[in-house]
Amino acid sequence: MKKIWIVAAATNLAFSLSAQDSGVETQAIGVVIDAHAIVDVVDDEIVFDFSADDPAEAGDPFVLGSNKNQTTYLNYSLMLSNGGIDDGMISVRINDMNEGMHMTLLADSSPLASHDANQYGTLGTVAANFDAKIGASPVILNSTDQVLIENIGSSYTGNGAGNGYLLSFTAHINDYSKLDADNGAQDMGTITYTIAE
């Protein structure tokens, strides 16, 4: 029995001597971050209600009142998958706009002015043709995607009203002969925002 104990102790000592730590140790680490691209507008629906804008006198036209101007905020979160090239973008298009009307859009990045790049990342710039800060003329939306925000790196705008890009829409009459009343129901169109890299 004594021999077995001595053999076991010697074996244990041999293993513990070979497994001793050295003065330097390395350890592998892994970090997993999924690429993501999420875009949102604060208001799921913008209603241009012109029911109070009927002409008061015979012979007067129907004229769009103050409700022709509406605003909302565009928010996004983007994690690039391409090694840090700031090539993300958000495009915009409109479908099923009321006949006889069109919609224009301007975007303003002023709400992002205080966002620190170390915290929020590389925020995108408003495409020059949409940029309200440089005095661009409002862009007519159509069914073709148009680049609204460009040069987006891995970043996020913050969520909700007051965060992101201020979008200013204006409704216009472009063909009075095609206008028709909706009798209290609203005609529905769709504005689509697409974020991609």
Model-identified regions with their sequence ranges:
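N-terminal small/polar-rich segments of proteins
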Residues: 20-133, 138, 145-197
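Sec-dependent N-terminal signal peptides
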Residues: 4-16
